[in-house]
Amino acid sequence: MSDNWFDTLGVFDLETTGIDVETSRIVSAYIGVLDAHGNLVEQWNWLANPGVEIPVGASAVHGITTERARAEGRPAAEVVKEIIGVLASLFDRGLAVTIYNAPYDLSLLYHEALRNDLSPLGEPAPIIDPLVLDKAIDKYRKGKRTLEFAAEVYGVSLVDAHDASADAIAAGRVAQAMAKLYPDELAVEARLLHMRQIDWCAEQSADFQDYMRRTHNPDFTTSGLWPVR
């Protein structure tokens, strides 16, 4: 196996019932492995019955209704257990896993494990988070920092945004493109890059908190923990 994390790269994404990581439920999930050219070589897909109503707003984003999840989805506990198992197996193989805005997906997965009386994923590392990388490498670029915009900036096709598989694969390809554009900063050993992202995310959150306190709410707080909050 290559020493470059971006030559064989895991990718992961969730679609869920909402934005609160403590209370939202997994609706669909995708894990894949990309080769050095961004081609998909392995994949796992899940559709879950979250056990609760999927809000209309969430369904509008990812296209999965409560009715479909109940009819076609598997029990949440089974899905969560399998996701944790596959992620753990990728880390055991020495692969890094790309997750765009990792604290959302990994924190939600952590709370889903607890909710279903499962052991949470152990230390998830190494993680590659293109959102953190993009903010660190191109700090002053104007515009949104969504996956859709990042894909456009780094020349990656994203034709079905908010589908777990499309988002996961695009995030991985963005990470690969960034590593090739900025090798001095990003083409380093995966665990070293993981540690750098811990520091970068803390700095980014502190800057955002300072901005919000100056311009909107003097009591605003945000967590800089990464990759799990």
Q: Over which residues does each language-model region extend?
A:
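Short, surface-exposed acidic-centric catalytic microdomains
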Residues: 42-62
